[in-house]
Structure formats: structure tokens, C-alpha cells
UniProtKB/Swiss-Prot annotation:
One of its GO terms (molecular function) is DNA binding. Gene3D superfamilies: 2.40.50.580, 3.40.1350.60. It comes from the Bacteria. Belongs to the SfsA family. This is Sugar fermentation stimulation protein homolog. Signal peptide: none annotated.
Length: 236
């Protein structure tokens, strides 16, 4: 995925109201940027951090900038949760996700379940449908990438709906996309949301597949990185 325009560096002043952040550009100008992330953003939204912004594509929008990346301990981390679906879709189409190869059709935002939309629906003649849910991961604790960074009732609901697809004889895959490169493995944040962690463990026992990939990040774009080891052991 390429950014439409080069990102501009700034310094984070503060994030507030979840979707807003005040930043200061290198020339001293201060603006309020849009934050496309409803999570807690633990460890990625501390005042003084170096951040990278993209200009809004709509010139009429009130907030003229989008917060895309943040530098944490010398590593770029993606914080815009609007990108993972597109990154994964591009990678699947290019044959870069071995676990999701061999499908002729990729559809996005297809209705299913109870008032839900699946991120990707993969189809091919003679094969069961493959329902793919993508989750953005940016939380790191120790050497582990973890999800979620806040309680996610919606995420737990998605796992139940994926399990229903497996019971219907179809394929369901949970993709955790880690928007950083400095993690040794992935695991659920069981202390933050024990219900989600337990539901994920049960879903995988019931046939839902779970895979995890990192991202390669740069100020000009974000690409799929390497697969990451997963530990889905129940801890709570």
C-alpha cells in the first residue's frame, strides 16, 4: 500500500477524544489531526513522540491531516486502523499470503452474521467460501505483539460469527496484522480482555484458523511483512 502523498513528520502534543490529536510540525506550526483508531493505543500515543501524518484527500474536511505512523524506540508503528484490510487484500491478490492462496475472487465488506460485514470473502470454483476477518495490532509488551489493547465486544462477536461459518462447512480465517516489525511473536492480551482471549482459543479449537503477519513500514507506504509465531494458550 502506497500513501497518496509523502508523509510529513511532526511531534505529538496530545491525543484526546479518541479520534483527535494535537501535533507540532518541525516549523513550529500546530494542527489537530484525525486519529483513525478507537483503541487505547497503549505505548504509541505518548506526548513528545515522533509521528507521521498524511494530508486529507478531501479538501473540505475539517481536520486536514491523518495520523499514520509513530516512532517507538526507533521503530515505525502503524496506528491507522483503516489500512489493514487493504494491505491484506493487496497481499492476497499478489499471492503473498500462502495460507490464503488459490482463490479467484476477493470481495470486501460482505454482509454476514448479525449486522456484520466480513473484511474479505475469498471464493473459487470447487472450494468452500473463505471468510477472512482482519484485526490491526500495534500493542507490544515485552517481545510480544498483543491484541486487543482495550476490551472488544465487537471482536468477540466476530469470532463467534466466524465459528458459525465453520459449522456451516465453510472456511474462516482470523488475520492479525501487526503494524510493526519489532515483535518476536503474537498472543492475545488476556489480561486486557479475558473474554476475547478465551473465545479466540475456543474458536481455533472449533476450526477457525488464525494467522499473523508483520508489516514493513516506511514514510512512503506499508507492505505485508513476515509471518509471526503465535501463542494462543489460554492464560486467564
Amino acid at each position: 500500500m502506497r500513501f497518496a502523498a509523502p508523509l510529513v513528520r511532526a511531534t505529538l502534543i496530545k491525543r484526546y477524544k479518541r479520534f483527535m490529536a494535537d501535533v507540532r510540525f518541525d516549523d513550529g506550526t500546530e494542527v489537530t489531526a484525525h486519529v483513525a483508531n478507537s483503541g487505547a493505543m497503549l505505548g504509541t500515543a505518548e506526548p513528545g513522540m515522533e509521528v507521521w501524518l498524511s494530508p486529507a484527500s478531501n479538501p473540505e474536511r475539517k481536520l486536514k491531516w491523518n495520523w499514520e505512523l509513530v516512532t517507538v524506540d526507533g521503530h515505525l508503528v502503524g496506528v491507522n486502523t483503516a489500512h489493514p484490510n487493504g494491505i491484506v487484500a493487496e497481499a492476497v491478490a499478489a499471492g503473498q499470503v500462502a495460507e490464503l492462496a488459490g482463490y479467484d475472487s476477493i470481495r470486501r465488506e460482505v454482509k454476514y452474521g448479525v449486522n456484520s460485514r466480513i473484511d474479505l470473502l475469498l471464493e473459487a470454483e470447487g472450494r468452500p467460501k473463505c471468510w477472512v476477518e482482519v484485526k490491526n495490532v500495534h500493542l507490544k509488551r515485552g517481545d510480544w505483539a498483543e491484541f486487543p489493547d482495550a476490551v472488544t465486544v465487537r471482536g468477540t462477536k466476530h469470532l463467534a460469527e466466524l465459528t458459525d461459518r465453520v459449522r456451516a462447512g465453510e472456511r474462516a480465517v482470523m488475520v492479525y496484522l501487526v503494524q510493526r516489525e519489532d515483535c518476536a511473536g503474537f498472543r492475545p492480551a488476556a489480561d486486557i480482555d479475558p473474554v476475547y482471549a478465551r473465545t479466540l482459543a475456543q474458536a481455533t479449537r472449533d476450526g477457525v484458523e488464525a494467522i499473523c503477519y508483520t508489516c514493513r513500514l516506511a514514510p512512503d507506504g506499508i507492505d505485508l511483512g513476515a509471518p509471526l509465531t503465535m501463542d494462543l494458550t489460554e492464560r486467564i
